């Protein structure tokens, strides 16, 4: 029993420490693992203090996702901020292997979209939309956004 309690305590400490690594992290699960072109994914983030932040686009797909890369648009509005930019997220490398972190048949890819961006304290709305020719992207589990202090400041 003491061993279980000790293990649980360690896990809780590690999990609570992870929360301090980012200012905001949001993932939206996609119904039927399909991301339709008109399905804009929206995230509401709060920045607790003005400063420099890195903004990442998060993309989780299932093994079998057929595209080498995916084109997405990130639109971010907040206090004195209006940002609208398209990005290409690499999915499959030149060696024909999936990029990112894989676990069995699930793959997580992240793209640094905004680096050392000064964000003011306050509420932000972030929209992600895919810009692929294909209307419905299959085998997409989740898309998301992470905002964190630049790695050099952590």
Enumerate the language-model features and the residues they cover:
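Sec-dependent signal peptide recognition
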Residues: 2-10
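An anionic, turn-rich surface loop/hairpin at beta-sheet edges
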Residues: 87-117
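Short acidic/polar inter-strand loop motif in beta-rich domains
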Residues: 63-64, 107-109, 116-118, 130-141
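Post-signal-peptide N-terminal segment of Sec-exported extracytoplasmic proteins
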Residues: 40-69
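C-terminal motif of bacterial Sec signal peptides marking the signal peptidase cleavage site
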Residues: 15-17
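Exposed low-complexity, polar/acidic, P/S/T/G-rich flexible segments that act as propeptides
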Residues: 72-77, 133-154
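Bacterial signal peptide processing site
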Residues: 19-22
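Noncatalytic modules at the cell exterior or secretory-pathway interfaces
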Residues: 50-57, 116-132
């Amino acid at each position: 029993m003491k061993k279980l309690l000790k293990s649980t305590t360690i896990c809780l400490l590690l999990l609570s420490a992870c929360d301090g690594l980012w200012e905001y992290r949001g993932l939206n699960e996609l119904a039927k693992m399909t991301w339709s072109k008109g399905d804009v994914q929206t995230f509401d983030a709060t920045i607790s203090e003005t400063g420099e932040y890195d903004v990442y686009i998060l993309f989780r797909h299932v093994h079998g996702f057929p595209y080498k890369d995916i084109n997405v648009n990130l639109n971010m509005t907040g206090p004195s901020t209006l940002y609208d930019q398209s990005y290409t997220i690499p999915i499959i490398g030149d060696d024909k292997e999936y990029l990112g972190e894989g676990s069995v048949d699930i793959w997580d890819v992240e793209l640094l979209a905004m680096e050392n961006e000064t964000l003011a304290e306050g509420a932000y709305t972030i929209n992600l939309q895919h810009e692929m020719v294909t209307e419905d992207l299959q085998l997409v589990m989740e898309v998301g956004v992470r905002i964190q202090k630049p790695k050099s400041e952590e």
